[in-house]
């Protein structure tokens, strides 16, 4: 009986931990769709068709997903003219117009991207990153409107247009992983990115099967993952 009580205590503790975890974004009823070897025009067409499905509430897209098993990209952030002081960031290398709204990630300072085109030179940084920038370069008037550099880009100077709430990297049911120590930096994508996020009114097994069948029928020669 003592062993059984201990096991029940552990299970209950894990359940309460899961209830208390907040990844910082709304993942309820959201499915992730990807099409191997697809181009942006194909993804635009695909997402337009998905939006017409009767059980679909909303759609978005991104090149990075903050879950285990999906692409991650890390770079270094600094300010123009200072090559010594830099810090690591996790890069969300292309989110569309609906990403923050659909996943309910608040913009707490500044605004969403105002330059919505392929040559957008704006970025959104999370609160962790904003705090690091303020602490490192002693900015007393915040980060919105400031210029930063980010490695991995040909023209690597960007202007911060907004600050978002922090999100957690890793499995939803855990406390995340070591990447949570790194700030997130968001870039804009004018066209549909690789990972298409589909929010259903109610996510059921048949909803996923219908989604898989619809997308696969559109691109029979491509590998479709839902």
Show which residues each predicted segment covers.
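Membrane-interface junction motifs in transport/secretion proteins
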Residues: 18-44
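Short, contiguous acidic/charged loop-to-helix segments that flank catalytic cores in large enzymes
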Residues: 33-38, 83-89, 112-120, 134-135, ...
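"Rare, low-scoring activations can occur
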Residues: 41-60, 127-131, 152-226
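Alpha-helical transmembrane segments
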Residues: 2-28
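Short amphipathic beta-strand/extended segments in non-transmembrane regions
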Residues: 47-112, 226
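Surface-exposed extracellular loop regions of Gram-negative outer-membrane beta-barrel proteins
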Residues: 22-23, 65-69, 173
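Short, surface-exposed loop/helix-turn segments at secondary-structure junctions
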Residues: 72-83, 141, 173-182
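Hydrophobic secondary-structure segments that place a key small or acidic residue at a functional site
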Residues: 86-177
């Amino acid at each position: 009986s003592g062993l059984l009580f201990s096991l029940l205590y552990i299970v209950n503790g894990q359940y309460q931990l899961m209830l208390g975890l907040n990844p910082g974004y709304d993942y309820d009823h959201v499915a992730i769709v990807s099409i191997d070897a697809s181009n942006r025009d194909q993804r635009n067409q695909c997402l337009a068709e998905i939006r017409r499905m009767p059980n679909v509430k909303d759609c978005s897209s991104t090149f990075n997903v903050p879950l285990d098993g999906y692409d991650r990209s890390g770079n270094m952030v600094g300010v123009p003219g200072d090559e010594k002081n830099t810090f690591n960031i996790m890069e969300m290398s292309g989110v569309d117009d609906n990403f923050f709204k659909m996943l309910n990630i608040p913009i707490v300072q500044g605004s969403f991207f105002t330059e919505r085109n392929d040559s957008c030179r704006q970025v959104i940084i999370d609160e962790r990153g904003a705090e690091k920038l303020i602490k490192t370069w002693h900015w007393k008037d915040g980060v919105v409107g400031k210029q930063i550099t980010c490695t991995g880009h040909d023209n690597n100077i960007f202007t911060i247009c907004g600050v978002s709430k922090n999100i957690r990297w890793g499995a939803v049911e855990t406390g995340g992983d070591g990447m949570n120590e790194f700030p997130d930096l968001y870039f804009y994508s004018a066209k549909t990115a690789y990972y298409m996020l589909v929010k259903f009114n109610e996510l059921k097994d048949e909803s996923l099967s219908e989604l898989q069948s619809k997308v696969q029928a559109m691109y029979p020669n491509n590998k479709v993952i839902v």
